[in-house]
């Protein structure tokens, strides 16, 4: 990639702010629906209907006329307007603080997540003590702002402890400040400012995540890894939706240069175009580029204005004349029945046309997702379902320069399993009155790495295949993962998903080295619509 010019980060942010606040006024929708699969599946009936042409694959959603009725119904679920007591209304019906005027709106809530559990296999007690907050609102119809923060302490089952201790990071959230102790300690925030100057354009600046796809997982860009600073522009042009996003990512494993031991950083540039060919059929094209901020000698490059290019990238050289990590992908969706859609993703990392569909070449790395999801299964109202298959070849997402691996804080930006796996997922959700029930089954087969060898599962390792490997899924220490989870919850307040929840989890990871089993039951008072993944 030819180097055009460089700008320091502070000047870029200042320039962005000037652009955002200088665009002319217009009335348009700017409010986001917080993304999590458990909230997202409640929109199945409205967004997968054959009479709607909603762009379903870019999340979080902006509330528009198609999903507004469903969203409002979710926020009013179980609300009893006859309750007059201020205390009772705040507990069951309303935000803790809620102000609505013609010029602006504002709300704020306290967000507890208090759980106690027992792992009967490991004979250990687990717990979660989270105190959080959220506040948000609108200014006119153009601006939306939101922030939340969480202070956490908790004890996890052994398999999650092993994960956290390995990378010193609580999955999808933040650094563990306990330094290897059994009780983990961490905190993190989410913040966004959304501005819609005209109906066709939304500009979002924040510290958040983005999800691309119609499935439970995404091989292209998922919400598994931790939050990152981002600037996201989304253009809605009828049947075509186009998104370009720039992100500032952390690499926790690259060699550090400064005396404070701060992580090295990298830039991410992402493009996604979704085309609703008809109400039933849509196709999308995805492109991502990861580039180091400084080379291995500590030479800082700044932000290359080439990354602002709205045109999709191909293989290129970054500002340091080092290869960037460039990925491409496709999405597809077809509504085979009303409220029922089949969907797919194809990820292409390294491409070798003569060996694309076989496993014989480690220079050919790709991934595939196929699935079906829908609402009102067997004509039962609010019985929603998903069946999904994912597979990613060894060494996909990795890079010859480890700092440009497709990760943030050492966690995959795609599937939590990384690469070198096959995965089957089934999920059922049912809601009746104030009760919600969820059941999930996962099966995965993958190849783990023996000591000092690289068989392609760990996307943080450099792209240096172990001699004799073929690129076949499952190479290495062949491992089977069986996972089952169920929850039953009673909704207390729909505004921030305050609920009592009973949960159970069975997990069995088995290979030639032995078996790691978990049998966990939890109960607690929970809130928020966060996605907190532990099904890996």
PLM feature segments, named:
Residues 1-32:
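Bacterial Sec-dependent N-terminal signal peptides
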Residues 4, 10-12, 186, 281-536:
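Exposed, low-structure sequence patches enriched in small/polar residues
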Residues 25, 168-170, 226-228, 237-239, ...:
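Short, intrinsically disordered/low-complexity patches at protein termini
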Residues 30-282, 287-293, 356-368, 373-391, ...:
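Outer-membrane beta-barrel channel domains
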């Amino acid at each position: 990639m030819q180097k055009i010019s460089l700008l320091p980060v502070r000047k870029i942010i200042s320039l962005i702010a000037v652009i955002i606040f200088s665009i002319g006024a217009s009335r348009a929708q700017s409010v986001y629906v917080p993304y999590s699969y458990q909230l997202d599946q409640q929109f199945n009936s409205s967004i997968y209907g054959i009479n709607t042409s909603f762009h379903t694959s870019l999340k979080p959603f902006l509330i528009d006329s198609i999903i507004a009725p469903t969203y409002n119904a979710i926020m009013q679920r179980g609300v009893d307007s006859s309750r007059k007591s201020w205390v009772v209304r705040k507990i069951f019906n309303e935000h803790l603080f809620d102000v609505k005027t013609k010029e602006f709106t504002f709300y704020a809530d306290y967000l507890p997540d208090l759980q106690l559990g027992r792992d009967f296999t490991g004979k250990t007690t687990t717990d979660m003590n989270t105190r959080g907050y959220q506040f948000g609102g609108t200014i006119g119809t153009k601006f939306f702002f939101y922030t939340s923060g969480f202070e956490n302490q908790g004890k996890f089952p052994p398999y999650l402890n092993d994960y956290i201790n390995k990378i010193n990071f609580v999955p999808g959230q933040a650094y563990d400040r306990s330094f290897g102790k059994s009780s983990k300690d961490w905190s993190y925030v989410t913040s966004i400012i959304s501005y819609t100057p005209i109906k066709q354009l939304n500009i979002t600046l924040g510290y958040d995540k983005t999800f691309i796809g119609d499935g439970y997982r995404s091989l292209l860009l998922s919400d598994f890894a931790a939050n990152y600073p981002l600037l996201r522009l989304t253009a809605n042009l009828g049947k075509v939706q186009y998104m370009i996003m720039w992100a500032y990512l952390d690499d926790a494993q690259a060699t550090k240069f400064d005396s404070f031991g701060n992580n090295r950083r990298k830039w991410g540039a992402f493009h996604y175009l979704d085309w609703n060919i008809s109400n039933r059929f849509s196709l999308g094209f995805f492109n991502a580029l990861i580039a180091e901020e400084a080379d291995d000698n500590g030479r800082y490059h700044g932000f290359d204005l080439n990354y602002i290019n709205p045109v999709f990238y191909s293989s290129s050289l970054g500002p340091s004349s080092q290869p960037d990590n460039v990925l491409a992908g496709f999405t597809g969706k077809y509504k085979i029945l009303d409220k029922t859609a089949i969907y797919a993703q194809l990820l292409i990392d390294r491409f070798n046309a003569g060996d694309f569909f076989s496993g014989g070449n480690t220079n050919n790395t790709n991934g595939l997702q196929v699935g079906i999801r829908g609402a009102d299964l067997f004509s039962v109202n609010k019985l929603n379902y998903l069946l999904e298959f994912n597979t990613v070849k060894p060494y996909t997402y990795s890079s010859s320069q480890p700092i440009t691996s497709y990760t943030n804080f050492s966690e995959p930006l795609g599937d939590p399993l990384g690469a070198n796996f096959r995965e089957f997922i089934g999920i059922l959700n049912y809601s009746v009155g104030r009760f919600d029930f969820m059941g999930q089954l996962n099966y995965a087969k993958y190849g783990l790495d023996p000591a000092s060898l690289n068989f392609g599962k760990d996307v943080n390792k450099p792209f240096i295949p172990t001699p004799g490997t073929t690129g076949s899924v499952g190479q290495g220490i062949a491992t089977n993962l069986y996972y089952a989870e169920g929850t039953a919850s009673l909704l207390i307040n729909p505004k921030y998903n305050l609920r009592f929840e009973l949960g159970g989890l069975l997990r069995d990871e088995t290979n030639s080295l032995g078996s790691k089993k978990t049998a966990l039951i939890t109960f607690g008072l929970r809130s928020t619509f966060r996605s907190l993944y532990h099904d890996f």
